[in-house]
Amino acid sequence: MKRFLIAAILTVALPLGTAAAREAPSTSSGHTAILAPLALAQRDQQNLAAARPDARNLYDLTRRLKLHSLAAINPYVRASAPNYAVGRVDTFWVAQATSGYFSLKAKLLLKTPHAYWYVQENMGIPRARLLAALRISAHVFETHVYPTDHAAFGREWTPGVDHDPRITVLCANLPGVGGYYSAEDLYPRSVNPFSNQRKMLYVNITAFALGTPDFDSTIAHELQHMIHWYQHERDDTWINEGSSVLAQVLTGYTPDGQDQAFAADPGTQLDDFCYGAPECSENAAYAHYGAGFLWMYYLYQQYGGDRAMRAVLADGSLSGIALFDDVLARLGSRDRARDAFRKWVIANLVDAPGLDSGAYGYRPTYQGCCVHAAVTASSSSYPFTRHARVNQFATNYVALKPGGTSTLHLQFRGDPTVRIVPNTPLQGGMEWWSNRGDEMDSTLTRALDLSHVRRATLQYDIWYAVEKDFDYGYVEVSTDGGRTWYAAPGRYTTNADPNGANYGHGYTGISVKKAGNHNGWLHESIDLSPYAGRRILVRFEHITDDAFNLSGLTLDNIRVPEIGFADGPGTSGWQMHGWVRVANLLPTHWLVQLVLYTRQGVQVRQMPLSASADGQATLTGLGHDVQRVVVAISPTAPQTTIPSSYTLTVR
């Protein structure tokens, strides 16, 4: 999907020791049934950390899957800059908010050192007023937005696919969106038929009028996306969108209330994003924008300003939460991602920049800054028990108020593990997972010898949650040693291609919505008889676009009965780039923090937890020196969007 823009004496007794998790002893047999869930989760975590999916390379994908050619694709559509003249009219492809494209004509009304300014024809705006407003925004862009975004994030690809250093800004009626940037425009039409073959930013001037701060803020937002694509193509959407809202603030504008949307819903998962999906409301989308922004804003203020942002974009090999471990190390900080997240959780609650050398607050730099996260639940009556679920890298804030006793005993128990994807492996407790991410290309490849059979079928069970019409999974065959591939049709694949992203026959959408599924699993059979009598390569491939992704694909029971092949519990014979053999478990890694509001100020304490996610604390002085206590509860399992459950008991 395109990157669309929507609008005193207090004592805290904490146990110092932690109990070791009990695990069944392992053996060298490789059978997973003898391992306790936590041990399986730890193994999955290690394997996932080692798995590095490739970045999506549209030239390579087009060559080997669409053109079936060994010839390289020229990334340029012209040899020199076109230097377009004011007054020309061009036809542009424009993405619709849900899926598909339409075309429109627009006239070039203004040319500045770094941009062409096109306006859709027949907008009904008097020419003199249109030009005056256009010149205002063009001046702001050249003198403020462009240099500010460059200082913080770097530069875009220049001269680009058309050898033109200028960016095209299309001002038009874009139903359902405020503006967007599409990386597909930076490729020739042989790669994507809907490419405009130039660097482009799109702004809906029926929503954000030319010559206004709203328009200029949108340009700052979308320009960051263009820069981000060139500097760190494979970054996750939540980081990219957070950076774009930060770009708005750095150029003097506001985050459009998205910070407050997150503050109202701090249970929003930081390392996830949603927009456009039926289950994603506008408020939920705004909260995701706000989470990403506040994280990037916090990093910007705490760890080095522009230098910190440059470090984020310079690390092209990593994305997600893992990226920030590396970034903070390279910035010379002792903190790592979970340290920064722990402090950020408290900053969002108390916003006290004078506390702990500024670690628990924001320095206000925009109108309306900053936030005080909403309390999720509260009690002044004890005993009190809360059973709840909370998203990964999100927080429940539970307030404990005075109520009949000054001493409280807290006991926490959380799920020690969480699933990676919302399914259950069918056989042996293990399944193949494609991994997940934006701009991702993960492959699972194996050689098959069909030279002694006249017919063959590739059978497997598949479960998938893939962004419909934008991301796809494939089963492919190669007869030339992997130089070119053919995406084979299956019972549940489609060759429909509304967005130029389907390389043949692909799985897209959600398998649980398909007729005949069993708990989301579908049994698939691919006819390999056309390749009988030959040695071939078979590949499972998952390709995602530059914005938004779901859980991915999982496979089980892979077999070719005619040659006696049945996939075992290990990985022997497979070439894996991004795919991982998993038990579908990760350690949860809970953070439980106690925020004490005392007469002397705010104090923050950590509750130590055992490996099995149990912990306890005793609080004294409530209602005397302590006005109230807030327990901040956050699970931090990466790469999953499944919530974790916990129980907090207070006596």
Segments from the language model and where they lie:
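Exoplasmic/lumenal beta-rich domain surfaces
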Residues: 476-535, 566, 571-591, 598-615
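Extracellular beta-strand-rich recognition modules
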Residues: 456-464, 536-543, 631
